[in-house]
Amino acid sequence: MKVFFTAWILTLLPVVAACAETGLADESKRLGSLPSKAKLSLDEDWSSGKINPKRWYALRKKWGQGNFGVVPENVALVKDLVGAKRQRVLRCEAHGDQYAGPITGQWKRKKRVGGVLVSKQHFASGRFEVVMKIGSVDNPRPRGIVPAIWTYGYRAVSVPAKLSDNFSPTQPLYHPSLQKWGKGQALYWSELDFPEYGKGGRFDRPMYNTFLNSKHQPLTFDAHGAADGRYHTYTTEWRTGLAPIKGVKDSQVAKAKGFYWVQDKAVAFGLYLGNPLKRLGRDRYAVCSGLTARHWIDGRFIGENKTFVPSMGGQLNLGVWLPKWAGPAPWKTAAVYFARIRVWQYGDPGDVLGILTEDITDNFGKDGQPLRR
């Protein structure tokens, strides 16, 4: 009997271990309670009936190929049924290949014009909760549109072209490895997409992308049918931290705007990717690093970004656009709707705020002509 009991226990142990591992895995995917340090930084339900210009601004801008931008005229507050309650929501309209109405985008073109609203505030680590509906129950997946939620921040830093291959003692934020759009033109870029639907007209696996300066990782995750013409809650938790970097000396960095910036090519770029450092002591530094961006829809874990996660803050963008890579848009109008928006900031030690501070600039006017700066 003792031998039988021992054998039974030995047989059961792997099963118990497997169940324990499954339980731990399930627990890691659970959307937990907010950290005690979390601060509610944005709570928008549109109940005032107006888009508050101290909180938000609408873009008149074109980027990418095969479209004519986004315009403020395609952004408005309307009434809609959210769950069982009729309330005000943000409506971002898209004009397809058959649109012939009065609203125009770049070059006064009518087709393939969307609408995007952007927060005035820049955010870093924290929880982002956005209630969004794509299309309608009758047409939940309008081909050709890219409905999206994303954070974005940027900063251009310039030096004369003849100095472009080296660091600059007068411009410590300039980095020769971040040159873009010409010699001496460095660009800091922070972006998280959570998510971006519609590539190739598909809505099953939206993109969850990360952009860290010159680095980028595109991922897709199963949205489990959330593009169904109904409201769903999209939640993303962004975390940052400090990653110790060995061998960096005080003589190899310059202090600017509260952070330390590498000024020596002997420090391998791959160790910090253009991110600033924090000083821990004499000849001791840590990189301000993005750690993870984890994603849920209606409380169900969707996936996680762990590569090229930014640490620099960005503004929250909500809306819809129609790039070439979304495919044909064989209809007149479609729309994406946003109900309540909430953002809690965590203030993680790797956060970099106060560096990317500019609003996104318009690049064409109401007349459709490019703006010259």
Q: What are the roles of these predicted feature ranges?
A:
Residues 1-4:
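Positively charged n-region of N-terminal signal peptides that target proteins for export
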Residues 21-373:
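GH16 jelly-roll
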Residues 6-17:
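Bacterial N-terminal signal peptides
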